[in-house]
Amino acid sequence: MQREKIAIAYSGGLDTSIMIKWLKDKYDADIVAVTGNLGQQKEIENLESKAIATGASGFHFVDLKKPFVEDYIWRALKAGALYEDVYPLATALGRPLLAKALVDVALEENCTMLAHGCTGKGNDQVRFEVTFASLAPHLKVLAPLREWEFTSRESEMDYAIKHNIPVSATKKSPYSIDENIWGISIECGVLEDPMVAPPEDAYQITTSPENAPNEATVVEIEFEQGVPVSVDGKKMAGLDIINRLNELGAKNGIGRLDMIENRVVGIKSREIYEAPAATILHFAHRELERLTLEKTVFQYKKNIAQDYANIIYNGTWFSPMRTALDAFVDDTQKPVTGMVRLKLFKGSVTLLGRQSPYSLYNESLATYTEADSFDHKAAAGFIQIYGLGLKTFSEVHPAK
């Protein structure tokens, strides 16, 4: 019989670190660990040696930063995708790309199974497995966290200690942290009580607003067809733009989010996020759309933004619906070109100005000075026709 070969999505965190040994022992299989680089800063050093020492027979480190920015983040930004009007979907956006990378390696290595380290009540299990089903439906999927004997992160840490598996989580600091260039999610520990304010040690990159500089930072961001192309007049690649805005935003306490969100499985969970660049760029992009999009397009696109956010959050990135919405979004973004000037100060983002060659703002129509060119007399007829339906209704059904 062919020996089983399992490709696992390997982050180097607590769950996936102990998962290598657990799977190897349970299935007597060869383990191929696959790490996708989405711009995370922590737990990426010595991953190969750590995976091999833990029992993996192979390791792949896949640089996904460029496609993550250009094919995922920018699409979500153009769509205005914020889950439940708050979360910029950093973790959710990365999952389909990580799952695709895992499938690609599994096919290359002739693996017979795919494995992930997602919990049985979280969102990521759905995102990974729906992507697997879309891209490689013939491969068997394993989800150890849904079946193994460990009932808490503390028991997982005990297993790691027993088998000399190095992990960064400790019983004193038990946070579960997921990081990529678009944002960081932090959960577990005291954060599970929604009445407990996040301890300062939970935050990974941002300065607290109280300790942020007393002098504001002014930043100018230029967009072309909805995509950021420069910061403070300097043209940059997308990755560099996000890095720069993460740096400026983190220094000024921007991007701390504390929300109760509705998970895919129906559970409400308390999530802490840090997303400086995402917060800044979504704000700037929306303000530029206010200036350049026709009224009905701007208002209708708000509905599309929620639909798009739900597609990302619910794990159906590789779907015809997302592709169809991309076509709509891309068409709306043709005039979203221009510059937005912002002030970053102690946790807040304030608009200072915006301009665009496609601006629909007409000062001669908007002004109340002598330069006013609006025909005020035309308003009477407009109002009469606009309200005619309600007037007719009220004549038949008078108010009581």
Swiss-Prot record:
GO BP term, pick one: argininosuccinate metabolic process
Enzyme Commission numbers on file: 6.3.4.5
UniProt keyword annotation of Nuclease present: no
Annotated metabolic or biological route of this protein: Amino-acid biosynthesis; L-arginine biosynthesis; L-arginine from L-ornithine and carbamoyl phosphate: step 2/3
Chain residues that bind ATP: A9, Y10, S11, G12, G13, L14, D15, T16, S17, G117
Molecular functions (GO terms): argininosuccinate synthase activity; ATP binding
Residues reported in the UniProt entry to bind L-citrulline: Y87, N123, R127, S176, S185, E261, Y273
Keywords: Amino-acid biosynthesis, Arginine biosynthesis, ATP-binding, Cytoplasm, Ligase, Nucleotide-binding
Location(s), subcellular: Cytoplasm
Family stated for the protein in its record: Belongs to the argininosuccinate synthase family. Type 1 subfamily.
Name this polypeptide is given: Argininosuccinate synthase
Organism, scientific name: Chlorobium luteolum (strain DSM 273 / BCRC 81028 / 2530) (Pelodictyon luteolum)
